[in-house]
């Protein structure tokens, strides 16, 4: 057999099968490789979350619009105008389609930070422009769905027609005049006039005073009737004689005169000074310096009756005020006694001492021929004794004011 018709060997058939199988597998691998490098929707969502927080309708006012942050010039240069005037007004799919075109022309450098995970660019089929315009302007997941529009209002009810009696009177038209009273028939008698009550006349006191006018003067006192008796003259009652009251009898007890020390001090005037001790009269010779002071009554020796001064005795208690005698009725004082003192106030004579009683040895006997002058202290003691007995009277005071001389 010639070589052209020779039956192919098994080795050649195996080579051909291997070549065919490799071609089939190689073509499928190439197709699978091209499919694996295309950018997916998840990759674009990752870019949108990185660029705008996943808000596909964002417009921050910085010149970058939409979820992939397109500029207006990039959006218009890559055919975005066929979907919407600007990127934030287009839908997510429309923005991804324009993003595929930008990725094909500029690569991942169009998004320097967020575009590192993108694969190769692949053309996308997008919705028509009319469907894109009907898409919501904002993402429902971020801003929520807008509230539905209110339903259109129902047809208004027809106006109610009021009846003629219910219609309000037109404004501006005068009311009709009241009908005039018909004239009475000529044959009827005129009505009797009604009794008109006379006007009530108020009294003068009941009338109100006119405003702005002075009040009327009070009416004068009416004249008394002629038949009344005239008033009694004022001089009918005789004045009481001045000498009707009899004078007080002269023998009435005079008012009690208080002593100088007992009288209350006058208001506003200084108190009287205490009476100083009276000096002895100038015509009397002073007592000798060697004379001893008078001894007490129980120690003094018997002295001559004409020289020894009477010892002060217990004074009688003063008489009552109604029992005192008037100054004119007082009895005369005893001779040699104080002037002005009553006899009942005279000092009693001292008891006689026995003649044989020897004088005490420590008492010096005054010579009989030398007159004794009473000490001023004796008068003072006498005055104190009188005051102790509540004796009052100007005559007694005057008598005490004069020194008493024994001799």
UniProtKB/Swiss-Prot annotation:
Induction: Expressed in actively growing cells, activated by CRP. It holds the Pfam family Transglycosylas. Residues 142-253, 271-371 are annotated as: Disordered. SUPFAM superfamilies: Lysozyme-like (SSF53955). Residues 1-33 form the signal peptide. Keywords: Hydrolase, Repeat, Signal, Virulence. Sequence repeats lie at residues 178-185, 186-193, 218-225, 226-233, 240-247, 248-255, 274-281, 287-294, 295-302, 303-310, 311-318, 353-359. GO terms for molecular function: hydrolase activity. The keyword Repeat applies. Residues 178-359 are annotated as: 12 X 8 AA approximate repeats of A-P-A-D-L-A-P-P. It is an enzyme of class 3 (hydrolase). GO terms for cellular component: extracellular region. Disruption phenotype: Not essential, disruption of rpfA alone has no effect on growth or survival in liquid culture, nor in mouse infection models, although cells are clumpy after 2 weeks in stirred culture. Alterations in gene expression are seen. All 5 genes in this family can be deleted without affecting growth in culture, however triple deletion mutants (rpfA-rpfC-rpfB or rpfA-rpfC-rpfD) are not able to resuscitate spontaneously in the presence or absence of O(2), and are attenuated in a mouse infection model. GO terms for biological process: negative regulation of gene expression; quorum sensing; regulation of cell population proliferation. Residues 160-170, 194-210, 274-292 have a biased composition (Low complexity). Residues 148-159, 171-193, 211-249, 293-312, 350-361 have a biased composition (Pro residues). Belongs to the transglycosylase family. Rpf subfamily. Factor that stimulates resuscitation of dormant cells. Has peptidoglycan (PG) hydrolytic activity. Active in the pM concentration range. Has little to no effect on actively-growing cells. PG fragments could either directly activate the resuscitation pathway of dormant bacteria or serve as a substrate for endogenous Rpf, resulting in low molecular weight products with resuscitation activity. Stimulates growth of stationary phase M.bovis (a slow-growing Mycobacterium), reduces the lag phase of diluted fast-growers M.smegmatis and Micrococcus luteus. This is Resuscitation-promoting factor RpfA. It comes from Mycobacterium tuberculosis (strain ATCC 25618 / H37Rv).
